Amino acid sequence: MQERHTEQDYRALLIADTPIIDVRAPIEFEQGAMPAAINLPLMNNDERAAVGTCYKQQGSDAALALGHKLVAGEIRQQRMDAWRAACLQNPQGILCCARGGQRSHIVQSWLYAAGIDYPLVEGGYKALRQTAIQATIELAQKPIVLIGGCTGSGKTLLVQQQPNGVDLEGLARHRGSAFGRTLQPQLSQASFENLLAAEMLKTDARQNLRLWVLEDESRMIGSNHLPECLRERMTQAAIAVVEDPFEIRLERLNEEYFLRMHHDFTHAYGDEQGWQEYCEYLHHGLSAIKRRLGLQRYNELAAQLDTALTTQLTTGSTDGHLAWLVPLLKEYYDPMYRYQLEKKAEKVVFRGEWAEVAEWVKAR
């Protein structure tokens, strides 16, 4: 039976997006998992808890016996069927448990007895997790160029189009503002960090990487925070600022936050519920900055939002949203970003419109 256990192997698994059959309990998987992992547990949460209690009270032999008793008969067969199907569907995959201990070895031995020789990760998830952390620390030492600019400047798209760009917001499943959530739930902090490490490893492996191109982010992106090693390097990085005309920014925001989000909600939930979700999304975003706007200004903008939604529902036009979006940008988002940028003005090395910044970055 096969095992993989070197540091180089661990990095290769992350770079290749090797399918991982993670046999830990769902509660462990939810706390942190590798990007290409699927959760097919040997024990569910209740079974794991019972075995853990038995181990503390009666020792390892009794706990092992209880585990075999709980996962037997039809339950074992159902889980075997799921593992077998996953192995056949992912012939290049590997098994993984918490530390490469009994759980992955038990599943491996059961599969071997059924005629499937499938490798496992010696050291388990813990070893992969440490590899991800160390890789991020090392790769963050390369030079970084940050793409800055006011809301609607197309920063994320510019980063996405660079071969050495890493889309932090895409990995975090959040666009970083009060209106930043997407239809995908954010990952746990550990899973986000693992995904980021894998993306950095893959990007670095594709080319002779000299520097990273990242969006100028705050420490938090929604509920995820950037690893401290990367955040520290970003505070020292050069910044290229996109300065597009206000009208161009409005066009981008209309496409991203009104047209696309309405489409995505409708596609996910259907016309009626999708519309309600879309309305709630916009109201929730505005409500999140109520305190900073002040109650009177918030109420005015919320009323304009309601009017714009009524117009959009009846005519399909999103033009009405400009009545609240324009003042929100001019009175809140733009002054806030300019204030933040002033504090790191010495880091700004280039300013220009979107295409000019893209060309400048390409030449680095």
Curated annotation (Swiss-Prot):
<comment type="function">
    <text>Involved in the post-transcriptional modification of the uridine at the wobble position (U34) of tRNA(Lys), tRNA(Glu) and tRNA(Gln). Catalyzes the conversion of 2-thiouridine (S2U-RNA) to 2-selenouridine (Se2U-RNA). Acts in a two-step process involving geranylation of 2-thiouridine (S2U) to S-geranyl-2-thiouridine (geS2U) and subsequent selenation of the latter derivative to 2-selenouridine (Se2U) in the tRNA chain.</text>
</comment>
<dbReference type="GO" id="GO:0002098">
    <property type="term" value="P:tRNA wobble uridine modification"/>
</dbReference>
<dbReference type="InterPro" id="IPR017582">
    <property type="entry name" value="SelU"/>
</dbReference>
<dbReference type="GO" id="GO:0016765">
    <property type="term" value="F:transferase activity, transferring alkyl or aryl (other than methyl) groups"/>
</dbReference>
<comment type="subunit">
    <text>Monomer.</text>
</comment>
<keyword id="KW-0808">Transferase</keyword>
<comment type="similarity">
    <text>Belongs to the SelU family.</text>
</comment>
<protein>
    <recommendedName>
        <fullName>tRNA 2-selenouridine synthase</fullName>
        <ecNumber>2.9.1.3</ecNumber>
    </recommendedName>
</protein>
<dbReference type="GO" id="GO:0043828">
    <property type="term" value="F:tRNA 2-selenouridine synthase activity"/>
</dbReference>
<feature type="domain" description="Rhodanese">
    <location>
        <begin position="14"/>
        <end position="137"/>
    </location>
</feature>
<keyword id="KW-0711">Selenium</keyword>
<dbReference type="InterPro" id="IPR001763">
    <property type="entry name" value="Rhodanese-like_dom"/>
</dbReference>
<feature type="active site" description="S-selanylcysteine intermediate">
    <location>
        <position position="97"/>
    </location>
</feature>
<dbReference type="InterPro" id="IPR036873">
    <property type="entry name" value="Rhodanese-like_dom_sf"/>
</dbReference>
